[in-house]
Amino acid sequence: MSSSSKASASSSLSSTATSSTSATRGSDGCVVCDSTASCPVCASGEYCVMTSLTCDKCPSTYCAKQSDSQLSSLSSSSSSSSSSNSNEKTSLIVGFTVGIVGGAMLIALVALYFINKRYWKPKRQKNKALKLEEASQSYGNEEEYFDDEDDDDEDDEDDGGMRKDESHTLFNTSLVPPTLNVPGNRSSASTTRTRASNILPIAYIPGVTSGLSTDKLQSKLRSSSKRQNAAGDIRSHITLGSSILDGLDDEDDEHNQVLNKDADDNLITAIRAKPKLVQIAEEESDKEIQDLDVIEEQTEADDLSHMAKSEASHGNNDEDDDEEGSFILDLEIPESIRESTQGSRTESPFEDKFEIHDER
């Protein structure tokens, strides 16, 4: 410390001492300070120091020289404060910059979305529709691919639904790919809108095959019909087999049981016939024609004997044949007609044009 500072310090201390001794004391016995102490003007490298207030002494100030440790602490504190201030400023600048950039990007994205929705998207759709329309026109008229040529007039509900689908398809033709309107796909579109089928239902009817030629067979049938339809050989019975009347008998079974109780006198006597199928070998020869003549003669004799037996047993079998599924009509031919038609061919309304008898 310099001599001047020491002198000033000593003078200040002496003055404070004299002031403290000369100062008045209060009721508590402590000195009463009249004014606050003020720091003097210190030289470079010095700092102002104030003493503490005690009961016997008022505070005093003086200049003291700064030490190296105090200077380093002051410099470090000042540097730390300045660095903290700079860090705060940097963080503020970075945050402000990020906020500005993020806000600008958000505004740009929103603007692009609205521009795309209002201008760019309708323009792209319009260009696409024009291209598809040009492509569809290059394949021909569009309306001919949607003609509904339905032959089924009863399916009106489906036709109405198809008309709705057709109108909807025509309305959205610009949005449909052009490959759907190609003429090659027309057949598939027409088949899906109709109930037509490519399958023809054919019922199998079992028949009798014959190896005889048409001319020979017709000549044999004519000769057999001439022999069978003589004046005295007119048939007086018609027999309907059970294969024809079985369906009706099954449906009316319960109804007939009720009627049988009240109408026993109106019952019809019937006999049941059993149909047979005969297969003729497919061989064209004169021997078969001769065999056919022999068979026809035998069957004629059998028919005559069978008719005689049936007429004899007809009266005895009325009660036994009440539940059968066929009936017999008895026709009486006057003798005058029989005598007048002898020697001539008479056609019967019940004539069997084609008969095939079982081989015995």
Curated annotation (Swiss-Prot):
GO cellular component: cytoplasm; endoplasmic reticulum; fungal-type vacuole; fungal-type vacuole membrane; plasma membrane
Key word Glycoprotein present: yes
One Pfam family named in its UniProt record: Opy2
Glycosylation sites: N172, N185
UniProt record, GO biological process: mitotic cell cycle G1 arrest in response to pheromone; osmosensory signaling pathway; osmosensory signaling pathway via Sho1 osmosensor; positive regulation of filamentous growth of a population of unicellular organisms in response to starvation; protein localization to plasma membrane
Subcellular location, principal: membrane
Subcellular location: Cell membrane; Vacuole membrane
Residue numbers of Phosphoserine PTMs: S285, S348
Bias (Low complexity) ranges: 1-24
Acidic residues bias: start-end ranges: 141-159, 282-302
Miscellaneous note of the record: Present with 1160 molecules/cell in log phase SD medium.
Protein name: Protein OPY2
Organism: Saccharomyces cerevisiae (strain ATCC 204508 / S288c) (Baker's yeast)
